[in-house]
Amino acid sequence: MKASMFLALAGLVLLFVVGYASESEEKEFPRELLSKIFAVDDFKGEERGCKGFGDSCTPEKNECCPNYACSSKHKWCKSI
């Protein structure tokens, strides 16, 4: 009884994986995923005039972006 339940469950999992793989090939999932990843990397490459969360800063200067403040103890931008 346990073996037959295990085989039935394994068969369902295999059916799901095969169906998902064939569907993702139709949608060109890998290409879409890679294009989205590279689009995010291009966005990160843009220079901005302020420093974001976790960036090093000098407490005396106002270098952090809005809604962030430079921690005098740790010397990095943190949320206010």
UniProtKB/Swiss-Prot annotation:
It is found in: Secreted. Residues 1-21 form the signal peptide. Residues 22-48 form a propeptide. InterPro entries: Huwentoxin-1, Huwentoxin_CS1. Its main location: secreted. Keywords: Amidation, Disulfide bond, Ion channel impairing toxin, Knottin, Neurotoxin, Presynaptic neurotoxin, Secreted, Signal, Toxin, Voltage-gated sodium channel impairing toxin. The keyword Chloroplast does not apply. One of its GO terms (cellular component) is host cell presynaptic membrane. Disulfide bonds join 50-65, 57-70, 64-77. GO terms for molecular function: ion channel inhibitor activity; sodium channel regulator activity; toxin activity. Pfam families: Toxin_12. Monomer. Lethal neurotoxin. Selectively blocks tetrodotoxin-sensitive voltage-gated sodium channels (Nav). Does not affect tetrodotoxin-resistant voltage-gated sodium channels or calcium channels. The presence of a 'disulfide through disulfide knot' structurally defines this protein as a knottin. Belongs to the neurotoxin 10 (Hwtx-1) family. 51 (Hntx-8) subfamily. This is Mu-theraphotoxin-Hhn2q. It comes from Cyriopagopus hainanus.
